[in-house]
Design a protein with these regions (language model features):
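A detector of single, family-specific signature residues
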Residues: 1-401
Length: 403
């Protein structure tokens, strides 16, 4: 059975690291179809030639696979001449097994697009795509920082120092001052004098925790290098944070940035990194369910013979999924309805599944907040009573700043 075409002029692009193969399918006024095939290199002059050829063809649709990062530069070249290409999931365009060539792949893409069988993936605006470089590298630096802090803790334990037992945060102001003093070779009484009076542990316990079997020269050297690396990473992350926030404000994302912070579990940087990934315009997704599917937070759909089976979450945007899990962890410890939801889920599903389920719920709520341009509302919270409290949650303080 022949499939009736929807588009009359379509270009399919098979993109590789060093080569781009294009196939244009053009329907003539008499109903006949012609095929035009071209090959381009990977350099800027080649991408410019590709854009000029596409303009000459005048396509209704230009489609390409999301092949790693190779699609980005051809996409930008086409975008510069006013052509918004479709970037499609490679799993949705798998050809029938047989003879496989670059030309055949490009023609297959064009044929599917011509019949209206493809759906374009969400591609963020150019300004957000640019800011993703900052946000994602910032997340990578955060992972390196956490790893270095763990190494420091492990090395102190190796030397017999149990400071992590008596302080809640080994990298807090007081604990870091004591660690630096130990590295510098200060005596235990001198180190103990740096302990803050606000620490819950007694001076006797802190004194015992600072006792080491032996801090060797190798211990001191590695501890000194790790501490220097930690401080360098913290300084670098602060620069990334400042640049990301400045760029978002200049791009006009100040309002959604403020709205996101009214939800429990989301701080300023979390809101900024989420906004860079999903944007502020929810109409591009169409519904909260589609957004959750794109992120990969929705439950798997696995049904056979009328029986629904438990399914794993699908693959999606790993950067957003990681952020949502962090938000859910924080919201599960806040004074809000999300905490009650997490505790109810935790009894039935366990901690890890409950975090994913709560992250899914938060994402759907975020969609509604950004779509309606409104702040988060928790029906179980007495906002007037909490706003006058000295220890009001941060997300309530953010809401009060709006008014």
């Amino acid at each position: 059975m022949d499939i009736a075409p929807i588009y009359k002029r379509v270009i399919g692009l098979d993109v590789h690291q060093a080569q781009i193969t294009g196939c244009a399918i053009i329907e003539l006024p008499d109903g006949s179809v012609t095929y035009e095939r071209r090959e381009f290199g990977c350099f800027k002059r080649d991408r410019k030639a590709l854009a000029q050829w596409a303009c000459a063809v005048g396509p209704d649709v230009v489609v390409m696979e999301s092949t790693g990062i190779y699609w980005k530069s051809p996409y930008a070249a086409l975008e510069s001449v006013g052509i918004v290409a479709w970037v499609v999931n490679a799993r949705h365009v798998k050809a029938v097994p047989g003879r496989k060539t670059d030309v055949a792949d490009a023609q297959w893409l064009a044929s599917l697009a011509r019949a209206g069988l493809l759906r374009a993936s969400f591609i963020a605006k150019a300004d957000l795509r640019s800011l993703r470089h900052i946000a994602r590298h910032r997340q990578k630096l955060g992972g390196i920082l956490a790893s270095e802090k763990n190494r420091l803790h492990k090395l102190l334990t190796d030397a017999g120092i149990r400071l992590g037992v008596v302080v809640s945060d080994l990298h807090g102001q007081s604990a870091r001052a004591m660690v630096k003093a130990l590295i510098a070779g200060k005596t235990v009484p001198e180190v103990l004098s740096l302990a803050s009076k606000r620490l819950r542990a007694s001076r006797e316990d802190i004194f015992e925790a600072l006792q080491a079997e032996e801090i060797t020269a190798a211990h001191r050297f590695v501890l000194l290098e790790i501490m220097a690396h930690i401080e360098e990473l913290e300084s670098r992350i602060a620069r990334f944070d400042a640049e990301l926030l400045r760029s978002l404000q200049e791009a006009g994302y100040g309002v959604p940035l403020q709205l996101l912070q009214t939800m429990p579990g989301i701080d300023l940087m979390g809101a900024a990194m989420l906004l860079v990934e999903i944007g502020g315009d929810m109409s591009v997704f169409g519904s909260a369910q589609r957004l959750a599917s794109w992120v990969g937070m929705c439950p798997g759909n696995n049904e056979s013979a009328g029986k629904r089976k438990s399914g794993r979450i699908r693959k999606g945007n790993a950067w957003v999924r990681r952020l949502l899990c962090e938000f859910a962890q924080a919201a599960g410890r806040s004074r809000c309805a999300l905490k009650d939801k997490f505790q109810a889920l935790n009894v039935r599903k366990g901690h890890k599944r409950s975090i994913v389920a709560l992250g899914h719920k938060m994402l759907r709520t975020i969609y509604a907040m950004l779509a309606k341009n409104t702040h988060y509302v928790d029906k179980t919270v007495d906002y007037e009573a909490l706003m006058v409290a000295r220890n009001a949650p941060r997300w309530l303080q953010m809401r009060s700043e709006e008014h």
